[in-house]
Amino acid sequence: MALLLGLTGATAVASPSVIPPLPPLLGPRPAPQPQPPPPPPAATPEDRWALIIGVTDYAGRVKSTVGGANDARLVRDVLLRNGWREDRIRMLIDGQATGQAIAEGMRWLQANSSPTTFSLFQFSGHVKQRGGREFLWPYDSAFLADTDVVRALQGIRGTAWSSFSGCEAAGFDDGLSSPRHRVTASSQVDEKSYEDPQTGYSVWTGMLFDEGFRQQRGDANRDGVTSLDEAFDYAAPRAENFTSDQQPFGPQTPYRAGGDGPLRLDSPRI
């Protein structure tokens, strides 16, 4: 039967329902779910340091490159777009990139490194190979041997990325790569590296830093940020395919080693 409410303003109060007691829990209580680990700490803009070297015009009768200097400017632009401070970036272009200046620049990276810093070393230019060894070819032909380069870069504390763009570039990873030091190179130790006159960059640096990073074509998971591995995975097969018909030396196959996790330029882990 429906309950009729009069117009007297009185309110009908229903009897409370009786809720039976809950049965006791059977078995052990479920274990708490583990919380995801916090993200690794990242180097602040104050703790990011870069030495960028690019040589197009060499002293004397050494043949010029197409993209050495442009590569250096490209890398700098990508870093600035990712929040790096201009006063933490040292540029050595053409006549500035003497053998002495490069050696001093590597000592500068060492001196400014600490357990909380991230450091980038980038070289784009000629590489000389002799007697099974590789040499960075500075503007003034004051060659820097691979053993000296590796020794200097191994002295960097914190985490680091060393990027070499030149012929036989992977030869500079002579014990340099480690879980805290990523190494990338434009070609294997027995391969040449090439340049693209249409873009004005070396093939590898243009595809990695311009297409992969700056244009974000390497952003495979579409999260708006391109990691080094994403950019490398985008650029490496394209560089090899782009140079596949080069004769007599054949294509270049980019090289990657070291590192213990994703590397993002906007928040490099330390």
Where are these regions (language model features)?
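Caspase-like (clan CD) cysteine peptidase catalytic core
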Residues: 47, 103-124, 128-174
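Boundary/activation segment at the start of structured domains
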Residues: 3-120, 126-129, 134, 265-270
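Terminal, contiguous helix-loop blocks that mediate binding/assembly
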Residues: 80, 241-270
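Short, glycine/charged-enriched secondary-structure capping and boundary segments
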Residues: 65-67, 105, 134-137, 175-180, ...
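Active-site-proximal C-terminal subdomain of hydrolase catalytic domains
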Residues: 54, 79, 93, 160-250
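Residues that flank catalytic or metal-binding motifs in active/ligand-binding sites
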Residues: 132, 180, 204, 259-261
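Short, well-ordered coil/turn elements that cap or connect secondary structure elements
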Residues: 45, 84-86, 155-157, 178-179
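Stable alpha-helical elements in mature extracytoplasmic
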Residues: 68-75, 98-105, 145, 149-152, ...
